[in-house]
A protein has these predicted regions:
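Activation segment of protein kinase catalytic domains, centered on the conserved DFG
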Residues: 50-66
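Catalytic-loop of the protein kinase fold
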Residues: 75-93
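Activation segment/activation loop of eukaryotic-type protein kinase catalytic domains
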Residues: 89, 94-127, 134-138
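Regulatory alphaC helix of protein kinase catalytic domains
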Residues: 3, 7-8
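A conserved short helix/loop substructure at the end of the activation segment
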Residues: 213-223
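Short beta-strand micro-motifs within the conserved protein kinase catalytic domain, predominantly
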Residues: 20-32
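Conserved short submotifs of the Hanks-type protein kinase catalytic core
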Residues: 29-43
């Protein structure tokens, strides 16, 4: 029932950069199936990888702006809506090349039910997770906030800009989360890792990312 409520709630979100949910249904082996608009170009990372290198910077910046607009919208709602699971797989690209934020609410419910201070977050997503969400006392659970969305979006921007996962220098996601918990952040890669973005834009982008990754949540920028 809670999932149904979340789906109905998300159906009320009307923004050009939020993947529309058209309805819910049931089918074999799936008691609840969500019907969404079709995103013809798949997820953002795969889409960028399929472009010619000179095309990528402008397209990447467009996608980032699309998702920032979506986050500004949902965080500004009354009450605010928090995504809680931002990474490149949850950004889809439609036939027109627009970035669409998807899969929030439902993923958050699943994680609330399963994740504690002693649990392990699945799918490699610890690389994107704000440290306040896993620096917990035994038995505590997490609660995502607009500030933790900002942190995760910063990690996602780094991935889209360099086409490499956050904390690429760490062997695995546990090492990445340990580093983040100690206040460490991804090492700045050489300028050529950002493709054709250009040195001046890389400098501006990195300064923004450092603000988005601030260890203290209140020091992170709003969308």
């Amino acid at each position: 029932k809670r999932i149904q409520r979340e789906v109905i709630s998300q159906m009320q979100i009307q923004h050009p950069n939020v993947l529309p949910i058209l309805g819910i249904t049931s089918c074999d082996n799936h008691p609840l199936a969500i019907v969404t608009s079709f995103a013809a170009n798949g997820n953002a990372l795969s889409y960028l990888l399929g472009l010619e290198p000179p095309e990528r910077p402008a397209v990447m910046i467009k996608i980032i702006c699309n998702i920032a607009s979506a986050l500004e919208y949902i965080h500004g709602m009354l009450p605010p809506i928090v995504h809680g699971d931002i990474h490149s797989w949850n950004i889809l690209i439609d036939a027109g090349g627009q970035g669409l934020l998807c899969d929030f609410g439902l993923s958050r419910i699943k994680h609330e039910q399963t994740r504690t201070a002693t649990g392990i977050f699945e799918g490699g997503k610890l690389r994107y997770l704000a440290p306040e969400l896993f620096l917990l006392q035994p038995g505590q659970s997490f609660r995502s906030t607009p500030a933790s969305d900002c942190y995760a979006f910063g990690m996602t921007i780094l991935e889209l800009a360099t086409l490499q996962k956050p904390f690429v220098e760490c062997q695995n996601q546990q090492a990445a989360s340990t580093a983040a918990g100690k206040g460490l952040r991804p090492e700045q890669p050489p300028a050529d890792a950002f493709g054709a973005l250009g040195d001046s834009k890389v400098t501006i982008l990195w300064r923004l990312l450092e603000e988005m990754w601030a260890h203290e949540p209140t020091n992170r920028p709003n969308m």
